[in-house]
Amino acid sequence: MNPINYLYLSALLFTIGAAGVLLRRNAIVMFMCVELMLNAVNLAFVTFARMHGHLDGQMIAFFTMVVAACEVVIGLAIIMTIFRTRKSASVDDANLLKG
């Protein structure tokens, strides 16, 4: 398969994720869209690494996946805490910065 097709797929996935972040108000859905965007960037990194014959893109994708796994753990813990206290996962309802 042509590597350009993978870049098109990566751009499509990133666009879907960005639209989800901008249009949805549920924190869990927004979180999943951010993860979709990270995976799209990983796909682009691996595709560029494959096109140029280097392993740099694959290493960056691996480290991005490690950081994303940590983000999932911390992000879901925060979202679950907000849901338990506010009984809603909407980002519009969570004004936790008020004193």
UniProtKB/Swiss-Prot annotation:
Its main location: membrane. It catalyses: a quinone + NADH + 5 H(+)(in) = a quinol + NAD(+) + 4 H(+)(out). Its EC number is 7.1.1.-. It is found in: Cell membrane. It holds the Pfam family Oxidored_q2. One of its GO terms (molecular function) is NADH:ubiquinone reductase (non-electrogenic) activity. One of its GO terms (cellular component) is NADH dehydrogenase complex. It is a multi-pass membrane protein. InterPro entries: NADH_UbQ_OxRdtase_chain4L/K, NUOK/Mnh_C1-like. GO terms for biological process: ATP synthesis coupled electron transport. The chain crosses the membrane at residues 3-23, 28-48, 59-79. It is an enzyme of class 7 (translocase). Keywords: Cell membrane, Membrane, NAD, Quinone, Translocase, Transmembrane, Transmembrane helix, Transport. It comes from the Bacteria. NDH-1 shuttles electrons from NADH, via FMN and iron-sulfur (Fe-S) centers, to quinones in the respiratory chain. The immediate electron acceptor for the enzyme in this species is believed to be a menaquinone. Couples the redox reaction to proton translocation (for every two electrons transferred, four hydrogen ions are translocated across the cytoplasmic membrane), and thus conserves the redox energy in a proton gradient. Belongs to the complex I subunit 4L family. NDH-1 is composed of 14 different subunits. Subunits NuoA, H, J, K, L, M, N constitute the membrane sector of the complex. NCBIfam families: PRK05715.1-2, PRK05715.1-3. This is NADH-quinone oxidoreductase subunit K. The lineage of its organism: Bacteria, Bacillati, Actinomycetota, Actinomycetes, Mycobacteriales. The gene is nuoK.
